[in-house]
Amino acid sequence: MRVMGKVAVCIFFLVAPLLAQVRFVTGAPPAAATGPVFEASAGYSYLALDTLSRQRVGLSGVDANGFVDFNSRWGMMVDSSYARVGNVLGTGHSGNVLSFLTGPVFYPAEYGNTRIFVHTLAGVSLVNSAVPVSGTYYLGGAVTRFSYALGGGVERTVSGPLAIRVGGDYLRTTFANSTAAMQFQNNLRIVTSIVFRFGRR
């Protein structure tokens, strides 16, 4: 729950400047009928990886997304991310997390060129990491399991089809403990990306 609290704080500080002037799209008149709007994005990802020793390991990497906005409120996204660190908890073993997720996106409010989004994603994540066992011994390897993410953020159009997205997620993954039993990991992910929009929303 501490991780969920951190995600909530991050999202609050991202959207707080908009709340005094926000316009809820549910009260807006319907726009003229248009087809779906496609978007693609790429950017930087930071992952605070939960370990079984309750220490967090910071991983850095890249994130790429594809979006389809069906209307002003709802869309779908496909998310792929890769983050890496050279040394996990002093074991000398590198660590990385590769995720492929998809799910719905909801846009509850917008103001001018800025809109707020929330999403629920599910898919698989591969976690390659290590767990200290005793002394200089450690258990290392890769685990691929079901994974999901809950989060949101802010998107702002900067010029023509270009926009900037900043968001945060609670990301649930799985890795082994020192006895090789599978355990859940509660991770925090922050993503900053450039968005290119194919069409007008």
Q: Predicted segments — roles?
A:
Residues L49-L52, N87-G92, V133-G140, A176-M182:
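Extracellular loop and loop/strand-boundary signature of outer-membrane beta-barrel proteins
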Residues N65-T136, V143-Y148, R156, G160, ...:
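Gram-negative (and chloroplast) outer-membrane scaffold detector with strong preference
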Residues G168-D169:
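Internal, hydrophobic beta-strand segments that form the core of beta-sheet-rich folds
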Residues A20-F70, M76, Y82, A122, ...:
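Short glycine/proline- and aromatic-enriched beta-strand/turn motifs that initiate or cap beta-hairpins
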Residues G153:
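Short, surface-exposed tryptophan/glycine-enriched loops
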Residues K6-P17:
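Bacterial N-terminal signal peptides
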Residues M1-M4:
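N-terminal secretory signal peptides that target proteins for export/translocation
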Residues A163-R165:
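Extracellular beta-propeller repeat domains
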